[in-house]
Amino acid sequence: MFEWTWHLEWQTPQEFHAHAIKRILIEERSEFQRVILAELFRFGKALIIDGKIQSTLADEFIYHESLVHPLLISLEDPENILILGGGEGATLREALRYKSVRKVTMVDIDPVVIKFAKQNLQEWHMGSFDDSRTNLIIGDGYKFVKETNEKYNAIILDLTDPIQDSPSQLLYTSEFYRDLKSIITPNGGLVTQATSPSFSLDTFAIIYSTLKTVFKNVSAGITYVPSFDGLWGFIYASDVTNPAHLNRNQINDRIKERVTGSLRFYDGETHEMLFRVPKYIREKIENEKRVSTRENPVATPA
């Protein structure tokens, strides 16, 4: 009945989501991962790394605007921003929208992914790699954080999921979050992508619980990302601000004053929606006591 090729993405050991592939555009292997650019029937171009869809042309803006803007809009004129991961360049694109930003340092471990993105994901990065404020570093984010002498107003963690035995696991631990806090300015904060409350609620809750041991103000936001086929979670942390406390009028005023260009997903109403977390998820994260550590790092189920 259905003769096309399928991309099967396992969400748990017992569940997968299938996307029909129109064609494989490019496939490369690096020292670290397998990278595919495919054209999906429903979502168009899709970046797939190690079997996991990272983003698609049809809805990448939902994920990237939700990751970046609630934190940056809650801070007072962020000038120096650090991004770990984010190889597509779309997180960089959104951070550079802020009029106050003077420098965005982006650290990604894989030069193949960066070259791949520059050449093939123009709709994602929109030239952000060539912005004079961009400081692109190919390297290990963990090592960079340990060695940098700079302080940042905001840190954005656009990392791959903490799959069991992957290098990313150590970037979701209390030790690493303390290292990050040491390079954040007193008026700053961070945000991390936090996997899916739909498929890995325990993981989401443990990341939240872990950040609560490091920062005074921690809030969870969620939104539906169609190509991920589920809710996606983001956790924002700071000692001085909490984006969940801002209302739609404050958000809309700040966007008008501080942000260049036109956003497709995020505005005041969407901001309030992000923080309307369902009761069962609120109860889960508030009651979670487990903490991710180097000795026992959090992991997704698949």
Swiss-Prot record:
It catalyses: S-adenosyl 3-(methylsulfanyl)propylamine + putrescine = S-methyl-5'-thioadenosine + spermidine + H(+). Its EC number is 2.5.1.16. Spermidine binds at residues 64, 88. GO terms for biological process: spermidine biosynthetic process. Gene3D superfamilies: Spermidine synthase, tetramerisation domain, Vaccinia Virus protein VP39. The active site is at residue 158. The keyword DNA damage does not apply. InterPro entries: PABS, PABS_CS, SAM-dependent_MTases_sf, Spermi_synthase, Spermidine_synt_N, Spermidine_synt_N_sf. Keywords: Cytoplasm, Polyamine biosynthesis, Spermidine biosynthesis, Transferase. It is an enzyme of class 2 (transferase). Homodimer or homotetramer. Catalyzes the irreversible transfer of a propylamine group from the amino donor S-adenosylmethioninamine (decarboxy-AdoMet) to putrescine (1,4-diaminobutane) to yield spermidine. PANTHER family: THERMOSPERMINE SYNTHASE ACAULIS5. Belongs to the spermidine/spermine synthase family. NCBIfam families: PRK00811.1 (NF002010). This is Polyamine aminopropyltransferase. It comes from Sulfolobus acidocaldarius (strain ATCC 33909 / DSM 639 / JCM 8929 / NBRC 15157 / NCIMB 11770). The lineage of its organism: Archaea, Thermoproteota, Thermoprotei, Sulfolobales, Sulfolobaceae.
